[in-house]
Regions:
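Hydrophobic alpha-helical transmembrane segments and adjacent short intramembrane/lumenal linkers
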Residues: 131-133, 140-243
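N-terminal juxtamembrane cytosolic/stromal segments of multi-pass membrane proteins
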Residues: 20-86, 90
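Alpha-helix boundary/capping motif
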Residues: 1-7
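Juxtamembrane "helix exit" motif at the C-terminal ends of alpha-helical transmembrane segments
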Residues: 84-99, 237-240
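Hydrophobic alpha-helical transmembrane segments of multi-pass membrane proteins
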Residues: 41-44, 114-122, 191-201
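Membrane-interface interhelical loops and short amphipathic "cap" helices
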Residues: 94-112, 174-185
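Membrane-helix interface/capping segments
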Residues: 96-100, 127-141
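Alpha-helical transmembrane spans of integral membrane proteins, capturing the lipid-embedded, hydrophobic core
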Residues: 76, 80-84, 88, 116-125, ...
Length: 243
């Protein structure tokens, strides 16, 4: 009986997520019916929607209208910057900033803002190029812009981790978050790292969904394209490490 109840709970949770995604899609359709949404507003609404109903968001990337394409730039800028900040704040470098006498809390914030932007921009272009290579290898006729935008919206879970995990880390460890050693090492830190990796896996799943939807491919072809892109990225990083 316990197994049956547990199964029903899982099914109920899955159904709830599906209902939320459908309600968001219906709300967007109703809003468009009552009053046509501007491209800018529509793409801002798609930022949270990609977490629950990614297929409709990635399908919208097929649109080549100049106004629609331009409307994606600001949401993508925010996503890429937040994802970059989440990435740099999880590095060992960030974990030892306050060990340096020249750093204080305001300077750490400035460092996270600047380094996050640079890290995000480089990663966005590099991952976008790798995906462009992978999809071209599998016969895509799409351009670099569309591939990097697929990457950008796939980074939304990683950007979300900045709002979810980093405040938890600060609440648990305070300034020790930016010091080497101390209470921010051990089981708690391992749990936070596992959660961070969970957000990374979520982003990879969205990337695969995005490639499949944008190109209309099978899962096998999609997986091959993503794998080819990751292989190229690994090769590029390997060359940099050897230099």
């Amino acid at each position: 009986m316990d197994d049956v109840g547990h199964g029903r709970t899982l099914l109920s949770g899955h159904s709830s997520l599906n209902c939320v995604a459908r309600l968001m899609a219906v709300a967007l359709d109703v809003a468009e019916t009552r009053e046509p949404l501007s491209p800018d507003r529509a793409w801002w609404l798609r930022v949270p929607a990609v977490l629950l109903g990614p297929r409709s968001v990635f399908f919208a990337l097929r649109e080549d209208d100049p106004d629609d394409v331009a409307a994606r730039s600001e949401p993508l800028l925010l996503i890429v910057w937040m994802a970059g900040a989440a990435a740099v704040l999880a590095t060992p470098t960030a974990g030892a900033l306050l060990d340096k006498p020249e750093y204080d809390a305001p300077l750490v914030a400035v460092w996270a803002f600047v380094a996050g932007g640079l890290y995000g921009a480089v990663g966005y272009l590099l991952f976008g190029f790798a995906l462009f290579f992978g999809t071209r290898l599998l016969g895509s006729l799409g351009d670099f812009r569309r591939e990097r935008q697929v990457v950008g919206f796939a980074l939304t879970p990683l950007a979300l981790s900045l709002l979810v995990l980093f405040p938890v880390r600060l609440a648990l460890y305070g300034a020790d978050t930016f010091r080497d050693g101390g209470p921010d090492e051990g089981t708690g830190e391992a749990a936070l790292l596992a959660l961070q990796l969970g957000f990374v896996v979520w982003s990879l799943a969205l990337l695969a969904i995005g490639v499949r939807v944008v190109h209309g491919w099978t899962w096998l072809r999609t997986s091959a394209a993503v794998a080819a892109g990751i292989a190229l990225l690994a090769a590029i990083l390997g060359v940099f490490l050897l230099i």
